[in-house]
């Protein structure tokens, strides 16, 4: 009851206009160059252009080892749909294995096959580019202190469609999985019961309910609290505000029922995306969300400001689904300091900004009331 009362009052919270500290966002610290090294193989060369050592977190960047969205692929001016995974990573207690260290002016190379995360069977001419933000720590540290934005060159490739079609998709469905997913879509079932046990089903249903209430309350706060909206989304532009409100309302609707909707939700891994530190992931090409084992180690709803929990992880993942809101959100940055340092155009399209905004609004009221 206290939770419901707190969430219901969120929209009425009014904060004074204040300035908020930013984590340093450096737009010239890292250079990324793309080159073709095969029919669909791309090599990214990442160079530290600064004068100090960088410890770079690989999650959701051009260096991520998982089949995440590393590049944008266009043909005839239209973006080729991404078929890989969009994960939310556990960001607490980071260890060195998830970082790449670069000395000043040094470079590291990372190669990947774009045919594993895009259908390129049509063949022909394609344009590939990359943009994003790399969280960075100081040498010998895993504490994120800054973020380096990057924009790559445009890479033009002539791709053989037959060869591309022979490349196995990273998130490949088995015939059994395809059958389960098809039946779920026909029944418009949100949670696939066969993927859950009693405990994970209860936790997922609870997270959906909390996600709905958080999104509804955050939508009200976005329309009534200009200072907080500016803090999290770096703008008070009316059009941007309407996009954020509409997306939060869509997330609230999608979270409101476990028996219908536009997405399919799995309590356990189905396609092999639960890699180390992955809490949950989305396949935007299928409007499918999967909880990973460590998701259930999170609290249902945290009382810590900007901490991760089950409710905001579910909210985060729903923003990645095109059926919930189009265009769906990307993963440009993680964590409060990094997210509020994004330019407005990226902040309103970044999944974690929505999760953090919903959490921050709830936490602000929680500390006042309780």
From Swiss-Prot:
One of its GO terms (molecular function) is metalloendopeptidase activity. Its cofactor is Zn(2+). Gene3D superfamilies: 2.60.40.2970, Collagenase (Catalytic Domain). The active site is at 317. Its EC number is 3.4.24.39. The keyword Signal applies. It is found in: Secreted. InterPro entries: Fungal_M35_metalloproteases (IPR050414), MetalloPept_cat_dom_sf (IPR024079), Peptidase_M35 (IPR001384). It is an enzyme of class 3 (hydrolase). GO terms for biological process: proteolysis. Zn(2+) binds at residues 316, 320, 331. The keyword Cytoplasm does not apply. It catalyses: Preferential cleavage of bonds with hydrophobic residues in P1'. Also 3-Asn-|-Gln-4 and 8-Gly-|-Ser-9 bonds in insulin B chain. Residues 20-188 form a propeptide. Keywords: Cleavage on pair of basic residues, Disulfide bond, Hydrolase, Metal-binding, Metalloprotease, Protease, Secreted, Signal, Virulence, Zinc, Zymogen. Binds 1 zinc ion per subunit. Pfam families: Peptidase_M35. Disulfide bonds join 196-267, 274-292. Probable secreted metalloprotease that shows high activities on basic nuclear substrates such as histone and protamine. May be involved in virulence. This is Probable neutral protease 2 homolog TRV_02539. It comes from Trichophyton verrucosum (strain HKI 0517). The lineage of its organism: Eukaryota, Fungi, Dikarya, Ascomycota, Pezizomycotina.
């Amino acid at each position: 009851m206290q939770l419901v009362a707190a969430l219901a009052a969120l929209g009425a919270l009014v904060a004074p206009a204040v300035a908020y500290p930013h984590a340093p966002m450096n737009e010239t610290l890292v250079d990324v160059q793309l080159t073709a090294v095969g029919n669909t193989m791309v090599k990214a060369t990442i160079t530290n252009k600064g004068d100090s050592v960088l410890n770079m977190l690989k999650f959701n960047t051009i260096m991520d080892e998982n089949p995440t969205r590393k590049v944008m692929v266009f043909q005839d001016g239209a973006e080729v749909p991404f078929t890989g995974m969009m994960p939310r990573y556990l960001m607490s207690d980071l260890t060195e294995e998830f970082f790449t260290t670069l000395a000043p002016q040094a470079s590291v190379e990372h190669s990947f096959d774009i045919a594993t995360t895009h259908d390129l069977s049509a063949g022909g001419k394609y344009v590939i580019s990359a943009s994003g933000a790399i969280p960075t720590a100081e040498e010998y540290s895993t504490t994120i202190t800054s973020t380096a934005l990057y924009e790559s060159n445009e890479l033009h490739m002539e791709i053989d469609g037959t060869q591309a079609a022979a490349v196995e998709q990273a998130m490949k469905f088995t015939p059994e999985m395809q059958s389960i997913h098809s039946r779920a879509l026909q029944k418009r079932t949100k949670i696939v019961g066969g993927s859950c046990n009693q405990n994970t089903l209860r936790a997922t249903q609870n997270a959906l309910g909390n996600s709905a209430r958080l999104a509804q309350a955050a939508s009200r706060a976005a329309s009534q609290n200009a200072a907080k909206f500016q803090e999290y989304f770096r703008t008070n532009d009316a059009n941007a505000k309407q996009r954020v409100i509409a997306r939060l309302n869509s997330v609230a609707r999608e979270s409101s029922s476990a028996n219908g909707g536009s997405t399919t939700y799995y309590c356990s891994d189905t396609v092999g995306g639960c890699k180390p530190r992955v809490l949950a992931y989305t396949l935007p090409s299928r409007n499918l969300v999967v909880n990973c084992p460590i998701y259930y180690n999170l609290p249902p709803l945290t009382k810590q400001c900007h901490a991760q929990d089950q409710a905001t992880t579910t909210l985060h993942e729903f923003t990645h689904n095109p059926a919930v809101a189009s265009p769906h959100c990307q993963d440009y940055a993680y964590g409060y300091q990094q997210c509020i340092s994004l330019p407005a155009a990226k902040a309103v399209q970044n999944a974690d900004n929505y999760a953090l905004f919903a959490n921050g609004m709830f936490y602000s009221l929680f500390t006042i009331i309780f």
